[in-house]
């Protein structure tokens, strides 16, 4: 990414700065969601892997109160359930990949791990890629902004995948250069012109998975929801054809 846009960064002809940040997972140690105009964050789209034997060993050792207080009750979408036999069920469709349950259980894995067993208590899925979030910034004209999900999932394994993200970054830079006001960050431009217009300008189709604030609001107008849902399913069918 740096090599592709080094000339633009060295001789910026932009209304204001444009930050790129990359984080390997949703823990986001780079603070990219809060600070980056173009954030690339590692994620996965299949199910969380559960080592039920180690999970049960942890429940037996730590107790149900610990598990509920520190893990399951802190799931932001209440997607975790401990069954009567102390096994764990995760509603993966409602999982928002926040990493909390993995963060809590990861340091405990070594305590319960069997000889030769290398699987952690909980682990990310195998179908990995990145999500792209745009518009994050600290205080300037309109205060702090978190970025909005623009690409919910993109594979990042081949040279072609890298070219796609470079092309998208180029579209964003060009659109920002042509449409942003002086001393205006990407997030402020999106707030001014609307996220739908921004997506059209960079050539990305509207997707119901693009969210502004999880579980509270979506930029997709609900009065046109049925029409937008039909478009999304048609586009998804064409992509899979």
Predicted segments, located by residue:
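General structural feature for long, well-ordered alpha-helical segments within catalytic domains
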Residues: 1-5, 67, 71, 97, ...
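Long C-terminal interaction/binding lobes of large macromolecular proteins
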Residues: 199-241
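Inter-heme linker and motif-flanking segments adjacent to c-type heme-binding CXXCH motifs
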Residues: 80-86, 110-116
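Flexible, glycine/charged-enriched surface loops at secondary-structure junctions
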Residues: 14-18, 83, 178-192, 209-220
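Generic secondary-structure signature for well-ordered alpha-helical cores
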Residues: 10-14, 73-76, 80, 100-106, ...
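A hydrophobic, small-residue-rich beta->alpha segment in the mid-to-C-terminal subdomain
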Residues: 127-128, 136-180
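Short glycine/threonine-rich loop-to-helix capping motif typified by GTGT followed
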Residues: 31-35, 97-100, 190-209
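Small-residue-enriched alpha-helical segments and adjacent helix-cap loops
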Residues: 1-69, 74, 83, 89, ...
């Amino acid at each position: 990414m740096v090599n592709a846009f080094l000339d633009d960064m060295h001789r910026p002809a932009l209304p204001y700065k444009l930050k790129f940040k990359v984080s390997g997972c949703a823990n986001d140690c780079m603070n990219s969601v809060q600070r980056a105009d173009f954030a690339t964050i590692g994620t996965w789209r299949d199910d969380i892997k559960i080592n039920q034997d180690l999970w049960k060993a942890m429940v037996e050792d730590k107790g149900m109160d610990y598990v509920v207080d520190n893990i399951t009750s802190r799931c932001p979408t209440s997607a975790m359930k401990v069954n009567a036999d102390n096994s764990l069920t995760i509603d993966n469709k409602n999982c928002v990949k926040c990493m909390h349950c993995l963060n809590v259980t990861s340091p405990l894995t070594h305590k319960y791990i069997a000889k030769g067993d290398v699987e952690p208590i909980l682990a990310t899925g195998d179908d990995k890629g990145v999500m792209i979030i745009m518009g994050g910034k600290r205080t300037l004209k309109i205060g702090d902004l978190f970025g909005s999900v623009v690409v919910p999932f993109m594979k990042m394994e081949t040279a072609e995948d890298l070219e796609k993200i470079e092309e998208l970054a180029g579209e964003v830079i060009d659109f920002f250069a042509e449409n942003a006001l002086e001393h205006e960050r990407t997030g402020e431009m999106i707030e001014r012109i609307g996220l739908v217009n921004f997506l059209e300008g960079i050539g990305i189709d509207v997707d119901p998975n693009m969210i502004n604030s999880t579980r509270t609001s979506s930029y997709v107008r609900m009065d046109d929801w049925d029409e937008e849902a039909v478009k999304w399913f048609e586009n998804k069918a064409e992509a899979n054809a």
